[in-house]
Amino acid sequence: MTERPDKDLAFMLQYENIAWYEDGAVRILDRRCYPHTVSFVTCTHYSEVAQAITDMVTQSAGPYPAAAMGMALAAYECREKPEAEQRAFLREAADRISRARPTTARRMARVCETMLEAAESAWNAGEPVDRAIKARAIEANNSRYRKIATIATHLVERFPKDGTILTQCFAETIVGMMLKEARAKGKALRIFCPETRPYFQGARLTATVCCEMGFDVTVITDNMPAFVMQREHVDVFYRQQFLNLFNRSV
């Protein structure tokens, strides 16, 4: 059996601990209170998945697997209906879920469209639609994690052996894969995490992932990055879609 790419990542970056469909329900890690409390929001209707996304139960890249698993749940909900009604139900679910959060609407619409394609394949093959959508969701996770792992491999090669990193917000899988690769290469990174108000993603999520994966991490306030960059010889600054490598000799 092929090793899953989330192996050896921190707890909250493993598939089942982001959003997971099973037995007619979707379970989503509640990042609003993590890591102080490890609790999950359980959804038994696709509209509850959409509401959880709206309510910031999950954020960063979390809404995308949540949307995919929500589509699997929608397929389960309408499984006894005639095929034409199932199609209409899933289309309605895709519309509702994709609009759950305006800032992620375009990408979530693409996710939902991919799950509708999986549903069509399942109908044509006479297979359970919810299982087919869940399988497609896991494939999407695998593909994204492997791409990020490849990027992390090339990125970490450029890190100093004892480098200092400044983060911003919570870069989800990027930070996990980067640290996994750094650990494999024996690089003892020192990490500074701004708190990231108002949800404190840096203090709660990034710092927790770094600590759990065995790295020296310090949480700083949001007005401290310039001071830290001046005093601590920062080699790398990154956030979700941006990275800068600094030359320490300059």
Residue ranges and their predicted role:
Residues 10-12, 18-21, 56, 148, ...:
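Solvent-exposed alpha-helices and their adjacent loops that cap or buttress functional pockets
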Residues 62, 171-173, 242-245:
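Short glycine-rich anion-binding loops that position phosphate/pyrophosphate groups of nucleotides
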Residues 196-250:
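Conserved phosphate- and dinucleotide-binding cores of soluble alpha/beta proteins
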Residues 174-182, 248-250:
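Short Gly/Thr/Asp-enriched flexible loops that form oxyanion-binding sites at enzyme active sites
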Residues 9, 14-126, 130:
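Long amphipathic alpha-helical segments
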Residues 147, 181-193, 200-204:
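Active-site histidine-anchored catalytic micro-motif
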